[in-house]
Amino acid sequence: MASLIYRQLLTNSYTVNLSDEIQEIGSAKSQDVTINPGPFAQTGYAPVNWGAGETNDSTTVEPLLDGPYQPTTFNPPTSYWVLLAPTVEGVIIQGTNNTDRWLATILIEPNVQTTNRIYNLFGQQVTLSVENTSQTQWKFIDVSTTTPTGSYTQHGPLFSTPKLYAVMKFSGRIYTYNGTTPNATTGYYSATNYDTVNMTSFCDFYIIPRNQEEKCTEYINHGLPPIQNTRNVVPVSLSAREIVHTRAQVNEDIVVSKTSLWKEMQCNRDITIRFKFDRTIIKAGGLGYKWSEISFKPITYQYTYARDGEQITAHTTCSVNGVNNFSYNGGSLPTDFAISRYEVIKENSFVYIDYWDDSQAFRNMVYVRSLAANLNTVTCTGGSYTFALPLGHYPVMTGGTVSLHPAGVTLSTQFTDFVSLNSLRFRFRLTVGEPSFSITRTRVSRLYGLPAANPNNQREYYEISGRFSLISLVPSNDDYQTPIMNSVTVRQDLERQLGELRDEFNSLSQQIAISQLIDLALLPLDMFSMFSGIKSTIDAAKSMATNVMKRFKRSNLASSVSTLTDAMSDAASSISRSSSIRSIGSSASAWTEVSNSIADVSTTVDTVSTQTATIAKRLRLKEIATQTDGMNFDDISAAVLKTKIDKSVQITPNTLPEIVTEASEKFIPNRTYRVINNDEVFEAGMDGKFFAYRVDTFDEIPFDVQKFADLVTDSPVISAIIDLKTLKNLKDNYGISKQQAFDLLRSDPRVLREFINQNNPIIRNRIENLIMQCRL
């Protein structure tokens, strides 16, 4: 049947997950982008498909194993292990604080009998008696003295198979390793002025942070990772660790990449944002004691300011979102003061400020990436507004404070009668503060937020300072300007197309023949047959189907199906067979995720209504999972979608994914589902209505939630194509047999077609009503 298309989409939409993840990982790892002119070298249009480009990240990741570095003399940072990797015997490292500690480490090859060897320690020839009785392991020994000319003593030998050694300055001590691998441990020597100890390494070395000491010990005992033991790892100078600090100018343009026709420019600018709120105050009719509305409204503000000696003319438009509606009613008399609705912005609200100026930065702001901004916080405090009553003392709304905190910036387009301007939309989240607001001579006091009555508090404007940065694709020739006709972004283009397509789709409902619709609803539509009405479908079928699946997998239906199996198993296992009110609540919760059991019998009806409304939303998924021979709402929905796709002249492969996804969520919103038990029918609707009745008389009977939940778990779920109201009307006016009633209850397509072919006005009217519900 036609609903097969939705099941195909639900099944196949998850097959694109892996390729999507690979693409996302690849784009997230991209660090820079070179613009290749490609086919655009011969045309006047810029590319509109953009990759992720450079992804800047302020997080500093410290490497686990930093190196190898060439032998050198340096002052190692404290709390860092210097991991030494010598290749020959002899002195491998030495260091001193030039006061009371001269310390060196010597490496001795395996199988060395006691012998005297001469070592060069701190510029002097020193003779030491050394030995290594191990036949296979190398031996590290520490030798130290307290004076430059004193005799050296030997300490803490380390017998090592990997031939690695490490030393660290930390907490007034110099730490080393001793023992025998693979069980070597750390030891230490006390030293004054330990942080000033300079060390000279005579072999390649690595640097490991102290918080990775466990990893350092693993290397000492078991050796370096295999990748460090290849000939491709070449030691570099320690100076490679030095960071060259370059301070970016606040206002500058940097060429990121350049080709023959296009170049990427990074634009850094400081910015001064001035804005103000506006509001609408409407008095209600009557004697003058009541106000209908006090609300925020957008307002544009124009101003000038200096930026690096340049005079900038700027425009800002301030609007709010997520307002909170308050009201006050002083009584029921015509002379009682009342406000039907006044708006307040609080923590759950957002303030949007669209900014545009006449500088060069905004003239080529068409193809933009890496947009970022840093702005200050601003506090907005409300003033007073007096409600002038005909008689009596005037109530005054006063106070209220919110702070605006930057929460992001996006590129937007402002349209005027003559031009479309690319602008920056700054989003601000809010926090409330003192003072609170109140209405004098009323009970309204100590409320927090900023009311719309007087949000500017006699100020001409609020001001925010900061800076923004973006990378824009512009013509390489500075004399050219990116055409403003291209300033509408790809997404805005798509939204405009979708808007036109929605209007066309909705107007096509009148042109659908019901008999053809029923025939189409019974066909097993697949991906290709569904989209065959689009031009060039054969060429674009594969990529178009993939795009539909990608978009569809983010739909509400696909998200719900991902939890369908768990929900069904939970429902089947947790439904109790007890008939108590408490067990009814628990059994319903298996479907509705209602965790609270019902204790008050008086609220049972309301609770059942809530439960059945939520159950009805899941019955669609149950019906999709267990298809019956009857026609369902998704068959009609898919058939209407197919018909409108074939008739449409606006649809394109770009708009198809959006339309299919939107249709799956919005077509036929008023759905009712039923389950049949012998001669009893149980129905539950999306609107929370529920009822049960007998098939032969259509007389209602008490609705047993326990029984309904059991039936839903074990029995097929059927779309109520012909609802109870239509059935009663049909029985009263035409008379139908019990078997016909059963067939209509099961949405038997053969019986439906018979009634439609007979031009039965009641059935036709019901189907036409369903078609009219298929709107976007």
From Swiss-Prot:
Stretches the record annotates as DGE motif: 308-310
Region Hydrophobic, annotated ranges: 389-409
Pfam family name, one: VP4_helical
Motif YGL motif mapped to chain: 448-450
Annotated site residue numbers, Cleavage: R231, N232, R241, E242, R247, A248
Placement of sequence motif KID motif: 644-646
Stretches for region Spike foot: 510-776
Assigned protein family: Belongs to the rotavirus VP4 family.
Protein name: Outer capsid protein VP4
